């Protein structure tokens, strides 16, 4: 209990809500889930596996991973070429994550400019994400819980501190 999350599972106590932290947005996520196979209204987002799919070469993945760390105020590898990383980011990432990396709740694209990292902020963590993508899941609870229980759960999750 408490919603603190762990690597790969979101912290419900912070302000980093992939799909929005209002009561209505939380309720929609609880009702329909994320990539739930049994709900046509489930929330879906898909980041390409840029490395695995051959969109980016290994050195380009590393450049963009360093650039992402730099916009989040984190250290980068020695010799990192920020201009090259920025160009790769602009061409491949900005459409979803925004020019400044602030994310897009409508798409479920996380904020890359804050200190909150669902899968880790290390260079190898980011390289892994850019190379192979990530696809978190959450079941749709509308078929398992009655509407009153979902509303109660919505209010509880919102009260943990991260809701807006």
Task: Indicate residue ranges for each PLM-predicted region.
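Short helix-capping and hinge/turn segments at secondary-structure transitions, especially at repeat
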Residues: 35, 70-73, 91-94
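Electrostatic cytochrome c docking/interface patches
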Residues: 63-88, 164
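Poly-acidic low-complexity segments
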Residues: 11, 77-81, 111
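Secretory-pathway/luminal and periplasmic proteins that interact with or process carbohydrate-rich
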Residues: 3, 36-38, 74
């Amino acid at each position: 209990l408490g919603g603190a999350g762990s690597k790969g599972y979101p912290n419900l106590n912070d302000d980093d809500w992939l799909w929005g932290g209002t009561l209505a947005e939380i309720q929609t996520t609880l009702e329909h889930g994320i990539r739930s196979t049994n709900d046509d209204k489930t929330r879906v987002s898909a980041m390409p596996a840029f490395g695995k799919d051959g969109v980016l070469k290994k050195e380009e993945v590393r450049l963009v991973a360093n650039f992402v760390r730099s916009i989040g105020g984190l250290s980068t590898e020695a010799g990192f070429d920020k201009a090259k990383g920025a160009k790769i980011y602009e061409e491949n990432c900005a459409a979803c994550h925004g020019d400044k990396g602030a994310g897009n709740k409508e798409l479920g694209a996380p904020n890359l400019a804050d200190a909150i990292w669902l899968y880790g902020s290390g260079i190898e963590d980011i390289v892994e994400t850019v190379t192979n993508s990530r696809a978190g899941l959450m079941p749709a609870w509308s078929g398992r819980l009655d509407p009153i229980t979902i509303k109660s759960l919505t209010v509880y999750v919102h009260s943990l501190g991260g809701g807006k």
